[in-house]
Amino acid sequence: MSEKSEKIYEAVTNISDELVESAGAKRKRPRRAWYISAVAAVLVVVIAAALFKPGGSALAIAEAAYDGHERLPDDISAPDGCFEALTAQFLSGAGDENAVLSPVNIYMALAMLAELTDGESRAQLLELIGIDSVEALREQAAAIWKAGSGESDECTSLLASSIWLRDDIGYVQDTMDTLADVYYASSYRGRMGTAELDKAIQGWLNEQTRGLLEEQAASIKTDPLTVLLLAATLYYSAQWTSEFNEELNYTDLFHAPSGDVDAEYMYAGKFMDYYSGEGWGAVRLSLRGGHAMWFILPEEGVSADALLEDAEVMRLMSTGEADGGEYAKVYLSVPKFDIVSQLDLIDGLKALGVTDVFDPAVSDFTPMTADSDEIYVSDATHAARVKIDEEGVEAAAFTVLEPGDTAPMPPELEIHFTLDRPFLFSVVTDDGLPLFAGVVNTP
């Protein structure tokens, strides 16, 4: 067992009030009110068994040791096809509702689930992820974890994961070690279906997401048939590199599918690249830390769902890559928004070819435990929240509006880019990892 694994599995204690209040892998980090973008995501996979045996109330607690941020190596490819498939599947059909997800967060949970399975159950997960073997998956997942995690004064992106074990079942130690070593999974053991354990799980989720998803976390509960609960989270915040001036904000109509609503718009005139394709236009706003937020606006008469079937749009949202940008003076109006959604992933994952893990008659969880049969995934819940505003943005050290000897000539093209109808967005790292993607139907 590695040193990291020993740290994660060495402690066994009873549930205490302090644990329930603060269960989780804590990081000492300041709370900064000046972040303009705060987003969080959580995915919970509940694995249940058809058989139940009562047990004690001991809870094993340990905290994962997180390595520092590293760029994605050149020889590691991100699972762009998986990111695109997840984004299209779970953002389509939102109707009048807003929808948001974290492709990276879902990917990490699916990768951990692949470690717990074998046979066709694992093969279906690997096919969706787009990788040939679990060994290659581990290398990819570890690299993505390090590339997607980091904290500085400019940008915070924090991944976390945990496994919650039933106290009357034995688990395969090698598999638990892998979850600790590759996925930095903190481990907990307790009596499933109790209010104490549920409160500890909810407390861990709230700790990792800084309380942004408290209502959604409160809905996560175990029952006596739960064999293992797997949780993966992502918290993110960053500053714009060029601020919006609050004095320029204005209120106007947003043409939502269900009817016009008032929205508060942030406004700026910026020199930037403008991207367009058949039925859409897009702009990229830079975030400190090298990240970016993309806004994709369908043309009049084109729906957001239609763009989710556009290969070029999906590549842009999933990788941050786009062709054919034109340098322009863009008059940009962006509605302030705070959107949250909670998704049941089971039907969508089945549509993407992952079926066996949900069927106790055919699922294969032998890498996890030999103590129970007919094990299956009974619940797969993903919650995410994204909010943006203009507050607290520091003045940029440099800006494209500042004249200089090497600045490009003023563009002839002028674009009025007003997000006053349903639009898509994504938050992408400098490595091309899609941390968040969403559709705003009503800001």
Located regions from the model:
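Disordered, charged N-terminal biogenesis/targeting segments of membrane/secreted proteins
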Residues: 1-29
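Internal signal-anchor transmembrane helix that establishes type II topology
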Residues: 28-51
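Sec-dependent signal peptide cleavage junction
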Residues: 48-66
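Non-catalytic, conformational "gating/processing" segments within enzyme and secreted inhibitor domains
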Residues: 57-62, 96, 134-301, 322-410
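Feature captures eukaryotic membrane-trafficking machinery centered on endolysosomal pathways
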Residues: 83, 98-122, 284, 411-443
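Post-signal peptide N-terminal segment of secreted/secretory-pathway proteins
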Residues: 89-157
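Short Gly/aromatic-enriched secondary-structure transition segments
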Residues: 125-129, 244-253, 304-314
